[in-house]
Amino acid sequence: MPAAAQPRRNRFIRTLAVAATGAAVLALPVLGATTASAATPAVSTATSLGYANNLDGWIRASLQVMGQHGIPGTYNGIYRNVIRESSGNPNAINLWDSNAAAGIPSKGLLQVIDPTFRAYHVNGTSWDSYDPVANITAACNYAAARYGSIDNVFGAY
């Protein structure tokens, strides 16, 4: 190929590469949504399990999921810890302790940090650590592994 044609050919190849990349980027959300929707299992929430969307319903829904997975705990044990940790606020976040200083603040009803939430997440619940049922269930799973049950937790854990 003559030297004069080389820059024009390189420009054409770069243009094709950019166009192909752009097309792929535009197609990803459509392809991903189709694939993800087909593979996404149903998530248990208080309302999907027939309970009210409040603290009582969240605890009862969590107990139902916990029962299905053999995670011990009682209504009173969960309630006591929720009130101490977040006063029942599912959006509570601790921005002042050592976890927060390390960039992983405690979140949700039972003030779980993200690494613990991910490690003790229970299938069938949301992966959102602020989701009340997912937060309670993961925290109870952690408490069961560490203390035998959430019922045995009487302070920060």
Regions found by a protein language model. Give the residues of each.
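Peptidoglycan cell-wall recognition and remodeling modules
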Residues: 53-157
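N-terminal prepro-regions of secreted/extracellular proteins
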Residues: 1-52
